[in-house]
Amino acid sequence: MCNSALILTMKYILLILFVSTLFSQSKYPVDTVIQSTEISILKKIGLLPISIWQRISYNSNYFNCQFYPSCSNYCANAIKQYGMVKGMVMGSERITRCNPFAIYYHMELNLPFYDKDGRLIDFINQNQNIETKKSPAFASIVSIFPGAGRAYAGRKLDGLMGLWTVYLTTSSAIYANNNKNRILGPLLIGFAGITYFGEIYGAWRAAKYYQKLEDNNI
């Protein structure tokens, strides 16, 4: 009975947040996307957690993102372009890369910085017209064991972060499921699946785009 009441309360809270975001002023970047008439209701629902997060992160210096665009905007754009599931997988991959080692890998590849605040420029769509010695397909396959694909692509530290992220989400999902938590169980299983496939996509992306340039063919 208690769980049913909690589920109903959460549904009402999410509905109120969704409606208020839908009709409020576009104070935060993702609000513009949510209020757009060009995307479906399903995508807008997927963007709701990002909207909530931006209301926290944009009002605290503790949550400043080192990337441009920020991880929340990156994820929002991915959902808008590729749909909720694929977009969340792509967003998960970016969040894994948003770690203390990002600046090292960025400088190693001589990638650009955002002029206004020095953040690391990293868009969804990359335009590197070069051949890589690493196989994106092979990187994806070996990522069946999380982290192995990124390590193969030359990003061992990102691989460790990916392995740790998958472990945390998966172990949390198993714990919640074993305790028969009807709310957190399915939710965390979904998160675990997203981070796992995000790791596979991240290995593919690392092997295809984030490689040292031997020939300047851009």
Predicted regions and their residues:
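Boundary at the C-terminal end of the N-terminal hydrophobic targeting segment
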Residues: 22-26
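Positively charged n-region of N-terminal signal peptides that target proteins for export
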Residues: 2-13
